[in-house]
């Protein structure tokens, strides 16, 4: 019985301390965007902004090493990559439209597209194996490899 009374008294004390007069929480502003679009170095920047407005997914050709390796629970240091040439992003976007974007409705993409799509000219693991497309460790990133002017030379079968 004494333990119960002690617990009740302790609970009342914590409750009384929690009800102090403090200033209200101020206005919390909106958070800035993670990436600034357009990135400014590609003729395809307008198309990339349109995709972001439609799908809320960043298509990035300019990013930093921490952007590339970041994961929610671990980092992804197992890839070596080379950035894509910004001038060939129109070719890359045409390719992505043909094999991905045109296959589903805009509503589907808006709901299920990864948060960011990082485009690389070359990407391979530290073991030397190539990954043509892979999800990042954070579950929000998608990496697309082998993006260059060569994409426009692919046939429909390839």
List the predicted regions and their residue ranges.
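Acidic/polar, low-complexity intrinsically disordered N-terminal segments immediately downstream
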Residues: 20-107
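Active-site recognition of the HExxH zinc-binding catalytic motif
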Residues: 144-158
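Glycine-rich, often proline-containing surface loops adjacent to acidic residues and nearby aromatics
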Residues: 73-79, 138-146
């Amino acid at each position: 019985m004494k333990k119960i009374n002690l617990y009740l008294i302790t609970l009342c004390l914590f409750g009384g301390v929690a009800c102090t007069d403090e200033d209200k929480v101020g206005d919390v502003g909106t958070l800035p965007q993670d990436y600034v679009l357009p990135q400014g170095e590609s003729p395809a920047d307008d198309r990339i902004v349109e995709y972001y407005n439609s799908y809320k997914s960043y298509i990035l050709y300019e990013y930093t090493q921490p952007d590339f390796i970041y994961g929610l629970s671990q980092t992804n240091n197992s890839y070596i990559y080379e950035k894509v040439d910004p001038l060939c992003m129109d070719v890359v976007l045409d390719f992505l439209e043909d094999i991905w974007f045109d296959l589903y409705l805009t509503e589907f993409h808006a709901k299920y597209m990864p948060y960011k799509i990082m485009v690389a000219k070359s990407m391979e693991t530290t073991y030397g194996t190539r990954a043509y497309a892979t999800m990042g460790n954070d579950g929000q990133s998608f990496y697309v490899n082998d993006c260059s002017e060569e994409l426009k030379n692919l046939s429909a079968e390839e």
